[in-house]
A protein has these predicted regions:
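Conserved RecA-like P-loop NTPase ATPase core
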Residues: 94, 119, 157
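Extended basic-aromatic, gly/pro-enriched interface segments that bind polyanionic ligands
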Residues: 140-192
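Conserved SAM-binding loop of SAM-dependent methyltransferases across substrates and taxa
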Residues: 121-138
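Short, well-ordered alpha-helices that flank and scaffold nucleotide-derived cofactor binding pockets
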Residues: 96, 100, 130-134, 159
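Alpha-helical elements of the RecA-like P-loop NTPase motor core of helicases
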Residues: 92, 126, 155
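Conserved AdoMet
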Residues: 2-115
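Conserved S-adenosyl-L-methionine
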Residues: 118-120, 148
């Protein structure tokens, strides 16, 4: 079994390769001082594949252009930090500036489409949906598209299932009981 140090050591040419790989597939810029991110986040992939080091992982990626492993590397380097009503000032601006304007400009069409890029597990997209419903847009045709580089987090978003700790983080109690139903230790979005 290789030591943790041997797994984590990255030769400079491999570090540059990883930087370029992540940038070209995700647009994420990882500066020279981010070795620790590669080391901590790629070590589990190295172990899972039975490799001896991150350098071996780079060799595999360069030699085969293995798309599944390449995707795992990119997903490992993304930060899936999200919670309900993250950045309250943003939601205030949506309520007080954007929605009144959209209501005026789209009154005849009554259709709105939003894109939640880097949606992670969906809390921010669902927060937007709740804002729209609370602000009287329930009879409008609303579409919110959530996208993310990570397939597993998108699957979680689609499920609409959240743990208690996740709903406690930013979600007002009144909206929790209005838009979610409890199921054991979890909360599921209802069809409101």
């Amino acid at each position: 079994m290789p030591s943790q140090t041997s797994i984590a050591e990255i030769r400079s040419e491999n570090y540059r390769f990883l930087q370029q790989h992540v940038y070209s597939h995700a647009g994420i810029v990882l500066e020279e001082d981010k070795h620790y991110l590669f080391e901590s986040r790629l070590a589990p992939i190295v172990k899972q594949l039975g490799l001896n080091s991150i350098n071996d992982l780079c060799t595999l990626l360069m030699a085969t252009r293995e798309t599944q492993v390449g995707r795992q590397v990119v997903e490992a380097m993304t930060t899936n930090e999200t919670y309900f009503f993250r950045d309250p000032a943003q939601y205030d601006a949506i309520r007080t500036v954007l929605l009144p304007r959209l209501r005026r400009e789209r009154q005849n069409m009554r259709t709105l489409r939003f894109w939640s890029a880097a949606a992670s597990t969906g809390q921010e997209a669902y927060s937007l949906a709740m804002v729209l419903l609370e602000d009287g847009f329930s009879d409008w045709n609303i579409q919110i598209l959530g996208t993310d580089l990570s397939s597993p987090v998108l699957e979680r978003a689609r499920s609409g299932k959240y743990q208690q700790i996740e709903v406690n983080r930013g979600l007002p109690a009144a909206l929790l009981v209005k838009y979610f139903r409890r199921s054991g230790m979890d909360w599921h979005l209802s069809e409101a």
